[in-house]
UniProtKB/Swiss-Prot annotation:
Additional notes on this entry: Part of a type V-M CRISPR-Cas system.
UniProt name for this protein: CRISPR-associated DNA-binding protein Cas12m
Family as reported in the entry's similarity comment: Belongs to the CRISPR-associated DNA-binding protein Cas12m family.
Record lineage: Bacteria, Thermotogati, Deinococcota, Deinococci, Thermales
Record text on cofactor binding: Binds only 1 Mg(2+) as opposed to 2 usually seen in other Cas12 enzymes; lack of the second Mg(2+) results in loss of target DNA cleavage activity.
Region Target nucleic-acid binding (TNB): start-end pairs: 482-516
Residues annotated to bind Mg(2+): D518
Region of interest (Recognition domain (REC1-N)), ranges: 1-59
Molecular functions per Gene Ontology: DNA binding; metal ion binding; RNA binding
Segments for region (Linker): 258-270
Binding site for Zn(2+): C489, C492, C508, C511
């Protein structure tokens, strides 16, 4: 760290909000432009990747060499395994790197950069606010690190707008800035709950875009339930997402503050956490922790929590049953209506037996409600009754789902804070939870029940809570290779006997005892961390 510089870190604060009091059209316009800009960047990147690949292949051919793609296809046709580590493929990649400084490639890259700048200018001319296109570019640059880029679907029911402070803005000036004006309440209101609840609501002015260099503001009621720290503001963003038939609004404030002081040792050493999900007696296990002081325990959602998550699924099932019954009854009525159908109704419902979305039936109800048909009482009554019941069940389902997700997150945060206070370092497995989730969705051999339990346990939420809790307190987080942590005995190093997918407790022939496989994995992580530390 340079002399005289203080360690700093970034903290994000999220607050509840109400819908903007005006300017919703401008909000949706910016959201649409953001989506279009992101998709245009994706389209451009995919095309530019093809151009770079083709040019590199031509340069390699001119040199009389095979490109990495050609080597890959040749080895694949020959039945080789592990091609990306094959010496010929590795050598081809190294040869390609030598071409990166070729004048023709540098010229192409320069032209492609200018194309991106021109695209930015074109969207700026369309009215996309500068902070929003910078925010989109930040998200895109992160996404383009992945080999697979995906387009985004526009939805008015979910989105965000952002104001970025690249140079930073002192928090004391956030109430009078030209981009965001967020009045900060007197700190005295946070001394007791009653006073805080009475005075936490403030009106934030948020700049959506500029019109002839003048700001176009929207006013958003925000509930500052906790005090914002003194520091440097880096970002203020407005978020919304749909919960059933209404929008839930939040405001996020990102503040750069002085780093936490160096934590004094607790004397209890490190704690290792093995992440996993399995049904156990009394609930759903999401992980197991073991400390160097010998303490340990499972991280689990209770039976009551499981029942509530199951209730969400039950509500969805009930809605599906009601929808199928409605579809069958309406189809029968439409086949033999008591009076000729108007053209719009016949055209609208000609594919009704294939409809699967409740939204299509709801749209049909809204139109039928304003364009009643002669002798339609029976069919319209069915549709009206279904719409009323389904709206209630939809609200029940969506609110319960969000409630349980927030409850789970809070439980994980409380546990993470407790461990971070008690221990000096965190040890977790280094593996890609997102890839595991995508594999589950892509048709893996994982049983449906295990896939469902993974979704409920949400190990990524648990890991994020743990990592954030230790990082906020200035304590290190170490990620270790998880290979064989479950199947190797932590006590003797021998192989455990049993099927980890079916049995919780595995047997060690050497120790002649059974071990909880999750506790065993956590102890192996702890032992490996100690071995690594001893080598330093």
């Amino acid at each position: 760290m340079p002399f005289g510089k203080k360690a700093r870190h970034v903290k994000a604060y999220q607050f509840g909000a109400d819908a903007p009091q005006e300017g919703m059209e401008a909000v949706l316009e910016q959201h649409r432009l953001r989506t279009d800009y992101y998709n245009a960047l994706v389209e451009m990147e995919l095309r530019q990747r093809e151009e770079r690949t083709a040019l590199l292949a031509n340069l390699a051919a001119e040199s009389g060499l095979e490109s990495p793609n050609q080597v890959y296809e040749r080895l694949k046709a020959a039945g080789e395994k592990g091609i990306r580590k094959h010496p010929e493929y590795v050598a081809a990649r190294e040869r390609q790197k030598a071409l990166y400084g070729h004048p023709r490639l540098l010229e192409l890259q320069s032209r492609q950069r200018e194309e991106r700048n021109a695209l930015r200018r074109s969207f700026g001319a369309k009215g996309l606010y500068s902070s929003n296109y910078l925010d989109v570019e930040r998200a895109f640059d992160k996404a383009r690190q992945s080999p697979e880029l995906r387009f985004r679907r526009y939805s008015p029911h979910e989105g965000r707008l952002a104001v970025l402070y690249t140079e930073g803005l002192p928090m004391r000036e956030i109430g009078s800035d030209t981009r965001v004006q967020l009045p900060l309440p007197d700190p005295i209101i946070y001394r007791d709950r009653a006073t805080r609840r009475k005075h936490q609501r403030v009106l934030m002015k948020f700049r959506v875009r500029s019109v002839e260099r003048q700001p176009l503001w929207i006013t958003v009621p925000v509930y500052l339930h906790r005090e914002l720290p003194d520091g440097v503001c880096r970002e203020v963003s407005l978020h919304w997402h749909r919960v059933a038939d209404r929008l839930r609004w939040t405001v996020s404030v990102v503040v750069e503050v002085e780093g936490p002081p160096v934590a004094s040792p607790t004397g209890r050493g490190a704690v290792a956490v093995d992440l996993g999900w399995r049904r156990v007696e009394g609930g759903l296990r999401a992980g197991f922790w073991v400390g160097e002081d010998g303490a340990g325990g499972e991280i689990a959602l209770s039976e009551g929590d499981l029942k509530q998550f199951s209730k969400v699924e039950d509500l969805r099932s009930i809605r599906d049953q009601h929808l199928n019954a409605l579809k069958e009854a309406l189809a029968a009525w439409l086949e033999a209506p008591p009076a000729p159908l108007p053209d719009w109704l016949a055209e609208e419902t000609k594919t009704l037996p294939q409809w699967r979305s409740p939204a299509r039936f709801a749209a049909l109800f809204r139109r039928w409600q304003s364009e009643r048909v002669h002798a339609d009482e029976a069919a319209y009554g069915l549709l009206e009754g279904w719409h009323k019941r389904d709206r209630h069940l939809w609200q029940y389902e969506a609110n319960l789902r969000e409630q349980m997700i927030l409850r789970r997150r809070e439980q994980y945060r409380v546990l993470a804070a407790t461990l971070a206070r008690q221990y000096d370092a965190l040890i977790v497995e280094d593996f890609n939870l997102r890839a595991a989730a995508e594999l589950d969705q892509g048709g893996s051999d994982l049983p449906d029940a295990a896939r469902r339990y993974r979704t409920i346990a949400s190990p990524s939420t648990l890991r994020d809570a743990l990592v954030n809790a230790f990082a906020q307190r200035g304590k290190p987080v170490r990620k270790l290779n998880p290979a064989h942590t479950t199947t190797d005995c932590h006590a003797c190093g021998g192989a455990l006997v049993g099927d980890p997918a079916k049995e919780l407790r595995l047997y060690c022939p050497t120790c002649e005892r059974f071990y909880d496989q999750d506790e065993n994995a956590a102890r192996n992580l702890l032992r490996r961390a100690q071995e690594v530390q001893a080598q330093v």
